[in-house]
Design a protein with these regions (language model features):
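Internal nucleotide-binding/catalytic subdomain
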Residues: 1-74
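A short beta-strand motif that forms the metal-chelation/ATP-contact edge
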Residues: 5, 76-86
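Residue-level signal for secondary-structure boundary sites
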Residues: 11-13, 23-25, 88-90, 138-141
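A broad structural signal for short, well-ordered beta-strand segments within beta-sheet-rich domains
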Residues: 12-14, 30-32, 79, 139-145, ...
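Pocket-edge structural micro-motifs
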Residues: 16-19, 81, 135
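Active-site "cap" helix and flanking loop/linker of ATP-utilizing ligase/carboxylase catalytic domains
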Residues: 46-68, 83-138
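A short, glycine/Asx- and small/polar-enriched loop/turn
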Residues: 72-78, 169-171
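Peripheral (often C-terminal) accessory segments that flank ATP-dependent C-N-forming ligase machineries
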Residues: 106-179
Length: 179
């Protein structure tokens, strides 16, 4: 799972747990999609949020976004990675679509202007997925934006050569859809 959160003066004021689905056929946990809300129980999600707050405290991360990747084993979360930033998978946009909290805007307003954006999460009743448009490296991009999606973006134009980054399956764009 992934936890995307936000801290103000050491307090975790926002936390959302998402299911992080990776390609099973490739090494290294190459991400395929994120799903909100998590399919794990509320108890597991609460443990993830508490562990995120504890990790932030121990690492002295006090203000701004926090991203934590965790593995769940027997209903118990274990940290894989913690970093004081927005995640690298455009989760801020999925979170904005899902519960009307804009972590990107909140980060800029708070960290640059020292102003805290007021927010009140209002999760929609739908499960949403952020799904990456992926292709093999060095192939010619064949994808296109999904007009049925809530949001869709391609990093390449049709026919562009897909750059090799991980050598297995490269991100070429993403869509946000209802499941």
């Amino acid at each position: 799972v992934s936890v995307n959160g936000y801290l103000v003066n050491g307090e975790l004021i926002f936390s959302l747990v998402s299911d992080r689905i990776s390609f099973s056929e490739y090494p290294g946990g190459i991400i395929k999609e994120h799903i909100v809300p998590t399919g794990f129980s509320n108890a597991v999600a609460s443990k993830c949020s508490a562990l995120t707050a504890d990790a932030a405290h121990e690492l002295k991360i006090t203000n701004g976004p926090i991203y934590v990747q965790m593995k769940i084993v027997d209903e118990q979360p274990y940290i894989i990675e913690v970093t004081p930033r927005l995640d690298g998978c455009h989760m801020w946009r999925l979170i904005k679509q899902y519960c009307r909290v804009d972590l990107l805007d909140m980060s800029f307003q708070h960290l640059i202007n020292n102003a805290l954006v007021k927010f009140s999460p209002s999760p929609c009743n739908d499960k949403l997925v952020l799904r990456f448009i992926c292709q093999a490296p060095n192939s010619l991009f064949e994808g296109k934006a999904d007009e049925q999606a809530m949001y869709s973006r391609c990093y390449y134009d049709m026919g562009d050569k897909v750059r090799e980054l991980n050598g297995y399956m490269e991100k070429c764009g993403y869509t946000i859809k209802k499941l």
